[in-house]
């Protein structure tokens, strides 16, 4: 049975939630493998909107096992609230349908406080555009071997020892940033209080998933954010604090690399970005505003307006390579309806030299100007199309040109937020 990884191939917000939900019908297990609740997925099911941040998208589908893997950093208080919200919408969530890896690091209140204080202290031009939810500092503690992990909640003495180790690091940082010292006892009490609500879902996820795989069950790995925010291959330092590319999927749940059979890259038919950092095809004119309005480009997590621009084939070709993308899902094609002319970035000019990739150095990225190829647009609507026959000829040509430029085929084409409005070319779960 095929196992599929879904990754964003741009700067996030590509429409992964809908595609994961669409694919989850074919999967037995849906697993989150990186990130925190700084990324949001919006699902529209039978007209009802579900907004998820920490929970895997599969929770809204009955009969599926949803998993939060060790590659995630988890805010336990946020998770409990999110579970309550989704339950209020009629979704059943129990230890039979949700598992959390025992070795998942926790996001503590001290992480969010540090995150926000750093961003406020940063000078103009050095702000990352973080959501302030503590994801970066939580990953720092993981790498620094001072995390409080899910399993630590089960024993008070162990919990206290891990909290003390973290405070040895955090208290000096807080003094330097002018933040009050941490109330150790209050933090331990808060963790002790929340512990039973988290521990009921705790499990050796690596073992469970290896057994599922041996039994021939289909696993869908759900990525958050996008490959251009990857800590190694993104537009550093304007990136997230985890590996986002497909290779992280196995590591982030405790499976070997041979567990991945198909990598589906989610690609928006234009480009958006939230927060700071380079964006070669950004439009600050009427076309950019039109893309934002038609695409409803506001962040699920923060409500921040997204920056919008033309499709960047050079960047997507790059992310398809670093994630080993087998095929893409092209989303929001309908947002381009009505444009007389469309532009696609095919490369960059850097100080007179043409490049077919975005360079690594931040100063060079900032100096790259896009080289465009123009294509005719279309006036007919593509919204709700469910077959190629429903698409205008110019829209089909646009899709085919995207495939040529990124050197990767379209497996799925999405034409609205509704899960049924999807054109299937290749089933990623096909054996």
Swiss-Prot record:
Disulfide bonds: none
Active site per database record: 13 (proton acceptor), 41 (proton donor)
Cofactor binding, note field: Binds 1 Mg(2+) ion per subunit.
Gene Ontology terms: cellular component: cytoplasm
Binding site for IMP: 13-16, 38-41, 131, 145, 225, 240, 304
Gene3D superfamilies: Adenylosuccinate Synthetase, subunit A, domain 1, Adenylosuccinate Synthetase, subunit A, domain 2, Adenylosuccinate Synthetase, subunit A, domain 3
One GO BP annotation of this record: 'de novo' AMP biosynthetic process
Pathway: Purine metabolism; AMP biosynthesis via de novo pathway; AMP from IMP: step 1/2
GO MF terms, alphabetically ordered: adenylosuccinate synthase activity; GTP binding; magnesium ion binding
Amino-acid positions noted as binding substrate in the UniProt annotation, renumbered to this chain: 300-306
Broad class of where this protein is predominantly found: cytoplasm
Enzyme category, top tier: ligase
Compartments where located: Cytoplasm
Matching NCBIfam families: PRK01117.1, purA
Protein name in UniProt: Adenylosuccinate synthetase
The gene coding this protein: purA
């Amino acid at each position: 049975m095929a196992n599929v990884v879904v990754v964003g191939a741009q700067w996030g917000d590509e429409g992964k939630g809908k595609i994961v939900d669409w694919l989850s019908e074919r999967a037995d297990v849906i697993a989150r493998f990186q990130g925190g609740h700084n990324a949001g997925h919006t699902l529209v099911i039978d007209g009802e909107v579900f907004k998820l941040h920490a929970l895997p998208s599969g929770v809204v589908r009955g009969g599926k096992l949803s998993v939060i893997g060790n590659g995630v950093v988890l805010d336990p208080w946020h998770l409990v609230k999110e579970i309550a919200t989704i339950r209020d919408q009629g979704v059943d969530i129990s230890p039979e349908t949700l598992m959390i890896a025992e070795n998942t690091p926790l996001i503590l209140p001290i992480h969010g406080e540090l995150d926000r204080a750093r961003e406020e202290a940063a000078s103009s031009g050095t702000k990352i555009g973080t959501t302030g939810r503590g994801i970066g500092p939580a990953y720092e503690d993981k790498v620094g071997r001072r995390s409080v992990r899910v399993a630590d909640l089960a024993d008070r003495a162990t919990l206290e020892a891990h909290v003390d180790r973290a405070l040895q690091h955090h208290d000096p940082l807080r003094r330097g940033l002018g933040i009050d010292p941490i109330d150790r006892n209050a933090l331990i009490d808060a963790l002790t209080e929340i512990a039973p609500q988290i521990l009921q879902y705790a499990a050796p996820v690596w073992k469970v998933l290896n057994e599922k795989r041996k039994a021939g069950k289909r696993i869908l790995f759900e990525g958050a954010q996008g490959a251009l925010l990857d800590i190694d291959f993104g537009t550093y330092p304007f990136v997230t604090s985890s590996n986002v590319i497909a290779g992280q999927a196995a590591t982030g749940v405790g499976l070997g690399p041979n567990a991945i059979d198909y990598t589906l890259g989610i690609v928006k038919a234009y480009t958006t970005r939230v927060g700071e950092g380079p964006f070669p095809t950004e439009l600050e004119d009427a076309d950019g505003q039109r893309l934002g309005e038609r695409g409803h480009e506001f962040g699920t997590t923060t409500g921040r307006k997204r920056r919008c621009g033309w499709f960047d084939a050079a960047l997507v070709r790059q992310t398809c390579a670093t994630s080993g993308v087998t095929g893409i899902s092209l989303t929001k094609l309908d947002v381009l309806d009505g444009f007389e002319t469309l532009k696609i970035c095919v490369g960059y000019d850097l100080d007179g030299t043409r490049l077919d990739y975005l360079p690594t150095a931040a100063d060079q990225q900032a100096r790259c100007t896009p080289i465009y190829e123009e294509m005719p647009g279309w006036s007919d609507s593509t919204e709700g199309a469910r077959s190629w026959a429903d698409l205008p000829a110019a829209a089909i040509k646009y899709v085919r040109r995207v495939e040529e430029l990124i050197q990767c085929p379209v497996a799925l084409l999405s034409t609205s937020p509704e899960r049924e409005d999807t054109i299937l070319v290749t089933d990623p779960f096909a054996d």
